[in-house]
């Protein structure tokens, strides 16, 4: 799978977390489990590449090809 077909959003923030979403090509999205959130090992196996600390935190039912990730902000950046 060519990684250039995977789209990575810009990061966005709230008081506690930074977020990003990752859009998979439709064919690749068929490999996303429907019963659980993916571990880092699972999403890396799909070809998603991002730095350490990101957690797949929510399944977006209407668009399962969009993976939602978050990671805690460093304590000094939290409000």
UniProtKB/Swiss-Prot annotation:
GO molecular function terms noted in the UniProt entry: chromatin binding; cyclin-dependent protein serine/threonine kinase regulator activity
Pfam families (alphabetical): CKS (PF01111)
Superkingdom of source: Eukaryota
Alphabetically ordered keywords of this record: Acetylation, Cell cycle, Cell division
InterPro entries to which the protein is assigned, alphabetical: Cyclin-dep_kinase_reg-sub (IPR000789), Cyclin-dep_kinase_reg-sub_sf (IPR036858)
Modified residues (N6-acetyllysine): 4
SUPFAM superfamilies: Cell cycle regulatory proteins
GO biological process: cell division; fibroblast proliferation; meiosis I; mitotic cell cycle phase transition; regulation of transcription by RNA polymerase II
Role, per record: Binds to the catalytic subunit of the cyclin dependent kinases and is essential for their biological function.
Similarity field: Belongs to the CKS family.
Quaternary structure annotation from Swiss-Prot or TrEMBL: Forms a homohexamer that can probably bind six kinase subunits.
Stated name of the protein: Cyclin-dependent kinases regulatory subunit 2
